[in-house]
Amino acid sequence: ADGKTLLATDHPNTSGGTFSNKLAVAADLSEASIEDLCIQIMQATDDRGNLINLMPKSLHVAPANWFEATRILNTTLQVGTANNDISAIRHLGIFPDGVKLNHYFTSPKAWFVRTNISKGKGLIFLQREAMSFERDNDFSTKNALALGYERYSCGIVDPRAIYGTE
């Protein structure tokens, strides 16, 4: 971790300089803003400035954007226009894992794109201790007692795993 927020315009590179995993100007979910963020992802570089094969994998939205995201990704033509142009997002299959709805985003307009960064090098979930259960009875009241215990940790190794806007 580099000490920055998950989405930042100034994540430090190990060899100097910075990179961004956030749109320069915050934008609502739209065909154009998705295309802009996908271009930013596909032009990503490693810590030495070399282009890497980073591609969008899935679109993550809050409930307020669920229907708009579905329209944008599933229409055969451009969204909300009289143009007869194809929907490049659908035609190219930009999001092979589709749209993911997250009920817990703190902003109703939040949306993010998860990338194909190597497993274990992006967003990580570590299960430190597996779920265990214990059961007992309270002697004086005869009430059943139950205890569930689990330990885990979440983090990020490389912020290039997720791009988005605020």
Model features per residue range: what roles?
Residues 16-43, 53-58, 64-166:
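Sequence/fold signature of self-assembling virion shell proteins
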